[in-house]
Regions:
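Glycine- and aromatic-enriched mobile tails/lids
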Residues: 3-6, 10-13, 22, 30, ...
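Core beta-strand elements of the Rossmann-like FAD/NAD(P) dinucleotide-binding domain
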Residues: 10-13, 198-208, 410-411
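Short beta-strand "acidic-cap" motif of Rossmann-like dinucleotide-binding folds
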Residues: 36-42, 246
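Conserved N-terminal glycine-rich FAD pyrophosphate-binding loop of Rossmann-like flavoproteins
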Residues: 44-77, 251-254, 262-266
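Short beta-strand to alpha-helix junction loop
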Residues: 86-99, 133-150, 173, 223-231, ...
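Conserved redox-cofactor binding core of oxidoreductases
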Residues: 101-200, 212, 256-260, 342-343
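Glycine-rich loop(s) and the adjacent beta-strand/alpha-helix scaffold that form part
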Residues: 208-266, 431-448
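An anion/pyrophosphate-binding glycine-rich loop and adjacent beta-alpha core
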Residues: 242-374, 448-454
């Protein structure tokens, strides 16, 4: 039982948003604009969310640089990048609504770079047919967070004038970690957690929760992710009864720093390649031309000369292979290093110095110039960077309704947006789609959470017993006199995931990973943290480990089950895509403490969307049965068009008669 001396701070809200990155802030703004009393829970300091690390830009088909761009082209690019495993409805909504979300952000005060005629500037990025990324130098994520924070402050000022308190309708709880979602039957009733500084417990009673907690990268040693990314939202959703989808798909960004060891994994923005940077191996060869897969061969240049012409004449030349989707580039770099053509630090060279004048590099890529000079003593205006793959993004996440963001499974009142949700990106995310994804689906999740609250006949109640259990679970590591060290456990977990569930996967290694994860589960159950509750990083990690472990098990199980290679999942023993597997989503749920894995059919794309693709392209992804359906659809459409034309001609009467008919009359 909970000690009577255990103090719990209690709050009542309509909507609780867990996560203060782009998705969380946009969801909170929407819930507050809908009139709901909203709490924002930030694991770190407010304004320090991992979104600030997103550098390149936000993808939106505004057509400011190339007027040929539109939502249909963006949709096609997103589906191609995800190898057609995307939830098509999410990809459609994203492509259609991203421009409006970017323009909206500008009305909030965002200061985007401009074209010469004053429009929002857009840059090239891997997998995007046209320049599409709205950007602020190479610090776009930072500007996005600054702008959304500014909007929240303006709402708080409005509340101060109307209600007498800045926190009356929207409040930020920073340096706060949520450890459990609390239920009333199958409905969300609240969230329980603690203040990281004091260790004091906090309880939010609320009928709706929006998860916006980001990714899982801290389960890997080499990662671009910040310390907060321990899979909290994924695990909270699982324990509450929601399902996770596509957890086998992890994106290893092709360009992370590899030297010095203390900064290995820190992101090197794709903007370097978008602005002309090229990849070379230790022999000086521009190697990406050797790695263009058949499914992309029509869109990418075959020679360096054509690739270089594309930057100034994209309408008459094909794209450089350095701008292939990230999964392709990461595998290529991995192969070069594995075959002995890597740099001394175990990466490859990324060269922008020979491609642009020094002043232009400093203007376009100020953060990269500062990062390499400060961390590696490398001047990128004079010498190439050493880069290699780094765990960057999880495509899998909470399975949600595409339109509302409501979680699937056995729980009601739970919503998810951003990286913690799954489906939008399929098997691989295109660069730039993340920031616009945050805005599109953050807005939708926040708005629909507010609608859900409005439609409730009565608010759910938090049971005393569930709070007591949450307290006991949180205190357990502190109450063990002996046990496993949390830092050792994290290192062991990272070794398992990095060595056995990394870029290249094999059946025996995945089976070994699951066996080792089972052993780690027993050890994590005995984790011990010395000291008290006041700012105790060992205790914090001990609690995070439970989340990291269950999410890692989902990834390993799904990776073992999917016997093909697609996007962010590469099986050396099944090296090609299998059209039959494209029709399958792998869905994880919890039965007690056991991860259950089920197969679920991928939703069929609507006719008007699948008709955006050529048959020759679809033949690379679809089964023969699906292609037959497509052919029948095309035939039916042609017949319908012919019938409609005949009907129109008949309705037009004599005016539609040809010259011969007129002569006969």
């Amino acid at each position: 039982m909970t000690s009577t001396t255990t103090r719990i701070e209690r709050h009542h809200y309509d909507v609780v948003v867990i996560g203060a990155g782009g998705a969380g802030l946009r969801a909170a703004i929407e819930a507050r604009l809908a009139g709901k009393k909203t709490a924002i829970i930030s694991k770190s300091l407010f304004g320090k969310a991992h979104t600030v690390m997103a550098e390149g830009g936000a993808a939106a088909a505004m057509g400011n640089v190339n007027s040929r761009d539109n939502w249909q082209v963006h949709f096609r690019d997103t589906m191609r990048g995800g190898k057609f495993l995307n939830n098509f409805r999410m990809a459609e909504l994203h492509a259609k609504e991203a421009p409006q979300r970017i323009w909206e952000l500008e009305t909030y005060g965002a200061l985007f770079d401009r074209t010469k005629d004053g429009k929002i500037s857009q840059r090239n990025f891997g997998g995007h047919e046209y320049p599409r990324l709205a950007h602020v130098g190479d610090r776009t994520g930072l500007e996005l967070i600054r702008t959304l924070q500014q909007k929240i402050v303006s709402l708080q000022q409005e509340d101060k004038r109307t209600h007498g308190s800045y926190d009356a309708r929207i409040r930020v709880f920073d340096e706060t970690t949520i450890t459990e979602l609390l239920l009333d039957g199958d409905r969300i009733a609240g969230a329980f957690g603690y203040y990281r500084e004091s260790g004091e417990f906090i309880l939010f009673e609320a009928p709706a929760v929006v998860l916006a907690t980001g990714g899982v990268g801290r389960s890997y040693k080499v990662t671009s992710n910040s310390w907060e990314y321990t899979g909290d939202g994924h695990a909270l959703a699982l324990r509450a009864g929601a399902t996770l989808i596509n957890m086998e798909f992890l994106q290893f960004h092709p360009t992370g720093m590899v030297w010095p060891p203390s900064v290995k994994g820190i992101l090197v923005t794709e903007s370097v390649r978008g602005d002309g940077g090229i990849l070379k191996n230790s022999e000086g060869k521009r190697f990406m031309f050797d790695y263009v897969p058949d499914v992309f061969r029509k869109q990418y240049a075959e020679t360096p000369e054509e690739a270089d012409r594309w930057y100034n004449d994209p309408d008459n030349n094909r794209r450089p292979p350095e701008l292939l989707p990230r999964d392709e580039v990461a595998r290529a770099i991995n192969t070069e290093v594995k075959e002995g053509r890597g740099t001394p630090a175990g990466g490859v060279y990324l060269d922008i110095a020979s491609r642009l004048p020094a002043d232009e590099i400093r203007r376009r890529l100020p953060s990269m110039h500062h990062q390499f000079k400060g961390l590696a003593d490398v001047d990128i205006t004079k010498e190439p960077m050493e880069v290699g793959p780094t765990c960057h993004y999880v495509m899998g996440g909470v399975e949600v309704d595409p339109d509302t963001g409501a979680a699937y499974g056995s729980v009601r009142g739970l919503f998810a947006a951003g990286e913690v949700s799954g489906g939008m990106h399929g098997s691989n995310r295109l660069g730039g789609n993340s920031l616009s994804d945050l805005l599109v689906f953050g807005k939708r999740a926040g708005g629909h959470a507010a609608t859900y609250v409005d439609q409730l006949p009565a608010r759910p109640r938090v049971a005393v017993a569930t709070v007591e259990t949450a307290v006991e679970t949180a205190l357990a590591p502190l109450q063990r006199d002996t046990g496993e060290n949390p830092y050792t456990l994290q290192q062991d977990l990272q070794a398992v995931m990095g060595d056995l569930v990394g870029i290249i996967r094999r059946e025996a290694e995945l089976a070994d990973a699951l066996s080792r994860l089972a052993e780690l589960r027993e050890r994590v159950a005995k984790v011990s943290a010395s000291g008290g509750r006041r700012y105790n990083p060992g205790w914090h990690l001990a609690l995070d480990l439970r989340n990291m472990l269950v999410v890692s098990e989902c990834t390993a199980k799904a990776a073992l089950e999917r016997r093909e290679s697609r996007g962010g999942h590469t099986r050396e023993d099944f090296p090609t895509m299998d059209p039959q597997w494209r029709r399958v989503n792998l869905v994880c749920s919890l039965e007690g403490d056991t991860v259950r894995l089920d197969r679920k059919p991928l939703p069929k794309m609507r006719a008007e969307l699948i008709n955006l693709f050529d048959r020759a392209e679809l033949a690379k992804y679809l089964t023969d049965e699906e292609l037959a359906e497509f052919d029948a659809l095309v035939t039916a459409d042609a017949a319908a068009a012919e019938a409609a034309a005949a009907t129109d001609a008949a309705a037009a009467g004599p005016t539609a008669a040809g010259p011969a008919e007129k002569e006969n009359r």
